[in-house]
From Swiss-Prot:
<keyword id="KW-0963">Cytoplasm</keyword>
<protein>
    <recommendedName>
        <fullName>DNA-binding dual master transcriptional regulator RpaA</fullName>
    </recommendedName>
</protein>
<dbReference type="GO" id="GO:0051301">
    <property type="term" value="P:cell division"/>
</dbReference>
<keyword id="KW-0902">Two-component regulatory system</keyword>
<keyword id="KW-0597">Phosphoprotein</keyword>
<dbReference type="GO" id="GO:0097167">
    <property type="term" value="P:circadian regulation of translation"/>
</dbReference>
<dbReference type="InterPro" id="IPR016032">
    <property type="entry name" value="Sig_transdc_resp-reg_C-effctor"/>
</dbReference>
<dbReference type="GO" id="GO:0006355">
    <property type="term" value="P:regulation of DNA-templated transcription"/>
</dbReference>
<dbReference type="InterPro" id="IPR001867">
    <property type="entry name" value="OmpR/PhoB-type_DNA-bd"/>
</dbReference>
<feature type="modified residue" description="4-aspartylphosphate">
    <location>
        <position position="53"/>
    </location>
</feature>
<feature type="domain" description="Response regulatory">
    <location>
        <begin position="4"/>
        <end position="120"/>
    </location>
</feature>
<comment type="function">
    <text>Response regulator of 2 two-component regulatory systems SasA/RpaA and CikA/RpaA involved in genome-wide circadian gene expression. The histidine kinases have opposing effects modulated by the clock oscillator proteins; SasA phosphorylates RpaA (stimulated by fully phosphorylated KaiC) while CikA dephosphorylates phospho-RpaA (stimulated by the phospho-Ser-431-KaiC-KaiB complex). A very robust clock is reconstituted with KaiA, KaiB, KaiC, SasA, CikA and RpaA; output is measured by transcription from an appropriate reporter.</text>
</comment>
<dbReference type="InterPro" id="IPR039420">
    <property type="entry name" value="WalR-like"/>
</dbReference>
<keyword id="KW-0678">Repressor</keyword>
<keyword id="KW-0805">Transcription regulation</keyword>
<dbReference type="GO" id="GO:0032993">
    <property type="term" value="C:protein-DNA complex"/>
</dbReference>
<dbReference type="GO" id="GO:0000976">
    <property type="term" value="F:transcription cis-regulatory region binding"/>
</dbReference>
Length: 249
């Protein structure tokens, strides 16, 4: 069965351009021209991926994305946001709303197709060999792939697909600085020239879930000019850190 993609964009020229190229690449494409219709179609069809313009009539893309993430029927569908704005704050707001990746208009068709393939691969909407199947653990952190969960100081933390992949990437290289280009290639599946803000927003989300004080991270550290490093205490040191977290209920 062909992967199904829902494209939501009020620009009819862009909508047709995207749809034609996706169909030529073997995808089943459905279309909507405003946020309300797009959200309704997403719930009805439960597509494999949603391409969502941010500046939509009736209901904007930010709101649509938030609603999709709150609905259990659509919460796990990868969302590729489309924006003509290209400003950092708009990208940040899109990621905060729950988008997985973004394309700034105008974009090259090949770049669009590459990002679509990467999102589908990463969420197992099409087969790939890189799926994590084994539990990974060090010190207070254990990652459980089948449920996209982390056990963190004996507490269960639910992660999005992206958060899980990002944390897995850092945990595999525990104690090492991981460059942004390496993170993008492994987690997002592509290697753009400059996409640091994408990583920064998702690192912030991880810190909110794992750090006792996200503004002063103790475990997920920024190595300025070089990348990010996950530093975890060994088993023998856990008692020195456990008091930062409330007792599990």
């Amino acid at each position: 069965m062909k992967p199904r993609i829902l494209v939501i964009d009020d620009d009819s020229a862009i909508l047709e351009l995207v749809a034609v190229n996706l169909e030529m690449s073997g995808y089943d494409v459905r279309k909507a021209e405003d946020g309300i219709k797009g959200q309704a179609l997403a719930v009805q069809l439960v597509p494999d991926l949603i391409m969502l313009d941010l500046m939509l009539p009736r209901v904007d893309g930010f709101t649509v994305c938030q609603r999709l993430r709150r609905d259990e029927r659509t919460a796990e569908i990868p969302v590729l946001m489309l924006t003509a704005l290209g400003q950092t704050q708009d990208k940040v707001e899109g990621f905060n709303a729950g988008a997985d990746d973004y394309l700034t208009k105008p974009f090259e068709v090949e770049e669009m197709l590459a990002r679509v393939r990467a999102l589908l691969r990463r969420t197992d909407r099409i087969p790939h060999a890189a799926r994590h199947s084994e539990i990974l653990s060090y010190g207070p952190l254990t990652l459980i792939p089948e449920r996209f969960e982390a056990i963190w100081f004996n507490r269960t933390v639910k992660l999005t697909h992206l958060e899980f992949e990002l944390l897995h990437c850092l945990l595999q290289r525990h104690g090492q600085t991981v460059a942004p280009s390496e993170i993008l290639k492994e987690v997002w599946g592509y290697d753009p020239d400059d996409d640091i803000e994408t990583i920064r927003v998702h690192i912030r989300h991880l810190r909110t879930k794992l750090e006792p004080d996200p503004r002063h991270p103790r475990y997920i550290k920024t190595v300025y000019g070089a990348g990010y490093c996950l530093e975890l205490p060994a088993e023998t040191e856990l008692h020195q850190h456990a008091d930062q977290f409330p007792s599990a209920s």
